[in-house]
Amino acid sequence: MFNKLSTPIHIIGGGLAGCEASWQIAQSGIPVILHEMRPQKKSEAHKTGQLAELVCSNSFRSDDSSTNAVGLLHTEMRLAKSLIMKAADANKVPAGSALAVDRDGFSKTVTAALENHPLITIKREEIQEIPENWPHIIIATGPLTSPKLAKAIQTITGTEALSFFDAIAPIIYTDSINMDICWYQSRYDKIGPEGTGKDYLNCPLNKEQYEAFVQALKNAEKTEFRDFEKTPYFDGCLPIEVMAERGLETLRHGPMKPMGLTNAHNPTVKAYAVVQLRQDNKLGTLYNMVGFQTKLKYGEQVRIFRMIPGLENAEFARLGGLHRNTYLNSPIILDQTLRLKQRPGLRFAGQITGCEGYVESSAIGLLAGRFAAAEYHYNCPCLPPLTTALGALLNHITGGHIVDEKTGRKSFQPMNINFGLFPPIASASYSGKRLPSKEKKLAKKQAITARALNTCIQWLINEEKNKL
């Protein structure tokens, strides 16, 4: 057991990830100094000086661990003795199958736990630079990282490694795409760095379908930017609904252009417009809608995007969005244990690494804390298996990405936990008979979660053995 006179691990940022990392490290017997600028300096979104303040919703989403990916992540984090999950459970409010919390009670519980821990010191101050004489650091400053610290991070990581605007296109589960309508083909059959000439899925629209789609976009309900998100649009990242409003033909000369594509199902008929889907992960279980960043309300996205031929039954792993964010190009600059490759004493955690959501941010904080603690004790960090929710999310951040056809660099966008991040599992059957589609989907999810919990328990056992 160390004491407060031992060399501490410095954690910058008192949000969900920073608090979880602090707890995991302190619980392993290592002193922590947690730096939080509030209330000395307020952010554009926070209202209080409490640690782990919930800025937006009070929901941690579904708590169903057998058929829901985020519910599975809840359970894995509970198994790993997560402070955030303990505080959420202690402050839960009625919300059906979801885990929702009293936001004030939740933040106070987390704050009290950290303030009362004998190995945690909380310093209310803004960190504007990354000190060279701190040997162990975790940066968990979230999507609203202060400008001076963001500049310091850019200096260390390189200017292209930090994004300030989050353009997200919807992502679709591959097995929900109608392959009787869609076909594989790259435009003009071009082969990219890791391509085959058939790297995109294509959804054809005739003139009538295209015009109805454009009109639906123009009439749809949009989500407005929050005050602290008001960043001007730039032409390379226009929401599709904004493009639709610029003219009827704008989209078919932009992301929906049909040139260089031939419908494999009907080669003699030229599509009037085409929506392209691009593989989003190495597993091939997810495809994103190319150029479809949007601020449409979620319900509108589902309704309108299912108008696209081939996507009439599409299931979405993530819906689109366009908002201010601060996140790293993590697959390029971080190693498997969330360390900056060029400065191994510096780790990143939470939303700044490229995860989305309260639970996901907390989970990456948990892993960063455990990895840092293992190294401090001169042990090799034990990575969670890819078959666990923790491992699948970590893999998304540090390596589960494909090379961008145009730039040759790994493409990377923030992501919530979803079943598309997990390795596939064999189709479920019952007594040798194949299940109906709906039952098959349910059985598949149950098989993935059962496998995940078994491997998570074994991972935690192995991690304990690693400490000996």
Swiss-Prot record:
Cofactor(s) of this protein: FAD
Binding of FAD, residues: G13, G14, G15, L16, A17, G18
Subcellular location: Cytoplasm
Catalytic activity: uridine(54) in tRNA + (6R)-5,10-methylene-5,6,7,8-tetrahydrofolate + NADH + H(+) = 5-methyluridine(54) in tRNA + (6S)-5,6,7,8-tetrahydrofolate + NAD(+); uridine(54) in tRNA + (6R)-5,10-methylene-5,6,7,8-tetrahydrofolate + NADPH + H(+) = 5-methyluridine(54) in tRNA + (6S)-5,6,7,8-tetrahydrofolate + NADP(+)
Record bears the keyword NADP: yes
Top-level taxonomic group: Bacteria
Enzyme class label: transferase
One Pfam family matching this protein: GIDA
Key words, A-Z: Cytoplasm, FAD, Flavoprotein, Methyltransferase, NAD, NADP, Transferase, tRNA processing
Family listed: Belongs to the MnmG family. TrmFO subfamily.
PANTHER family: GLUCOSE INHIBITED DIVISION PROTEIN A, METHYLENETETRAHYDROFOLATE--TRNA-(URACIL-5-)-METHYLTRANSFERASE TRMFO
Protein name, as recorded: Methylenetetrahydrofolate--tRNA-(uracil-5-)-methyltransferase TrmFO
Gene expressing this chain: trmFO
